UniProtKB/Swiss-Prot annotation:
Name of the protein described by the UniProt record: Large ribosomal subunit protein bL34c
Gene name tied to this protein: rpl34
UniProt key word Chloroplast: yes
Molecular-function GO terms, alphabetical: structural constituent of ribosome
Main location, first listed in the record: plastid
Subcellular localization(s) per the UniProt record: Plastid, Chloroplast
GO term, biological process aspect, one: translation
NCBIfam families (UniProt xref): rpmH_bact
Domain of life: Eukaryota
Amino acid sequence: MTKRTLGGTNLKKARTSGFRARMKTAAGRNVLKNRRRKGRHKLISV
């Protein structure tokens, strides 16, 4: 029997902590601003 893949988890992650989710709220935009200011290569950790 084949194992089931972890389908859908990436979509869930993206919906909660993706770029567009961050841009939606003022707090999320602050997160992005701080990560840009710190010089993070990746703004989103998904």
